[in-house]
Amino acid sequence: MKVNNLLEEYYLSFEYNNLREETKAQYKYFLGIVCSTNIVSSKKLGSYKLSDLTTKLAKLSYNKWCERGVSFANHLMSVIRVLLNYGINMEHCNVNPFSNIKKRVVTHRKVVWKKEDVIRFLDTAYSDFKTRSIGLIAQMAYEWCQRLGDMRLLKWDNLDLEEKRMYLQQSKRRAEVFLPISDELNEMLLQQKNDYGFQEYVAPRPRPFRGSYKPYSLVKLPILARKVMNSAGLSNELRLSDLRRT
């Protein structure tokens, strides 16, 4: 059995389908990158037989992923370990060579946004209808100190605009939080609901996909946010994910 074959089986498994929708999307994204990784002689990792996977190959793969960032590489390492552990449980393979590779330590970022940076970003994002949802995601993450992933998937059911409060069960810690909505943010949300209240997401992509409005993906959000940041003349050191620490 090849890695790609195991991946197809895993997507049909109880283990995968019992995950949260957001987690499933993340797994599919990262596992797709893992299986398309070229290591030796342009051969993709997904085309290797499970019996041909070695610790050396795992190490070379991880080193290549680290070229795109240690945190990114560690995400890939986590999902390939999950996949191969599933393979062991199903008796498709006997060992998980990626379990032998020590992850590198991620250096924690200390970059924060200045208030004037936030204002410039929001002014730029809100000046164009196409980027208004990106501005809302950023403003909500900033005001409530919440993860971008949670704000990206926030639904109208989470909001009480009359009482100006938000309810959320955090995706990572599973904690329930109730937070006030400022007058400025509430005004933007009312405007957003007037335009997008017919569907479930607070800050969807501006155009429908296959007949329905979808949230921004984990990949697209930072890319499109970077374009807004460049238009606003902000430093390349800033990341949208830094907002919750600001």
Description of each model-found segment:
Residues 8-22, 31-109, 123-125:
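N-terminal core-binding DNA-recognition domain of tyrosine recombinases/integrases
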Residues 71, 89-90, 139, 143, ...:
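C-terminal catalytic core of tyrosine-transesterase DNA break-rejoin enzymes
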Residues 74, 89, 93, 99-148, ...:
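Basic, Lys/Arg- and aromatic-enriched nucleic-acid-binding interface segment
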Residues 99-100, 163-169, 203, 239-242:
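Short functional hotspots where side chains directly engage DNA or cofactors
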Residues 108, 117, 144, 153-194:
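Conserved tyrosine-mediated DNA breakage-rejoining catalytic core shared by Y-recombinases
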Residues 133-135, 235-246:
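Short basic/aromatic active-site micro-motif
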Residues 182-235:
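Active-site/catalytic core of tyrosine-dependent DNA strand-transfer enzymes
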